[in-house]
Amino acid sequence: VFVDCTLYNDDIISKRALKSADVVFRVITPDLKGTTWYSSHKNSEREEGKDLFNIVNITENELYLPTEEVCSSLHSVISLIPYSKALKRQMLEGVLYDKTKDKAFNKKIQTIVSKIL
């Protein structure tokens, strides 16, 4: 069962799902908001004996994102999802659930899925 958890402290369903999970995948953006959230929550959702995997998701096409710094601070990054102009366009058009035609992005997602399974 996959549960998309929120970052809100008062979200009981997310807290319960994270506490009950055998494996946790955390997707973080390499920006101030993502790193601040990680720093304040890094011990709260992980229980002993659970696997925790970090994935860094680049959502903006900015030149100076601190991607390397964020990856080194996370210690267990299994993958880096590259920026996708096509996916950004789909998000802005409200058709995010449509299949994207960005071949490089799709290939990277398939690689991540292979690591997970």
Task: Give the predicted meaning of each segment.
Residues 89-111:
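C-terminal boundary of histidine-terminating zinc-finger modules
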Residues 5-82, 88-89:
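Conserved catalytic-core segment of NTP-binding enzymes
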Residues 2:
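Walker B beta-strand of ABC/ABC-like P-loop ATPase nucleotide-binding domains
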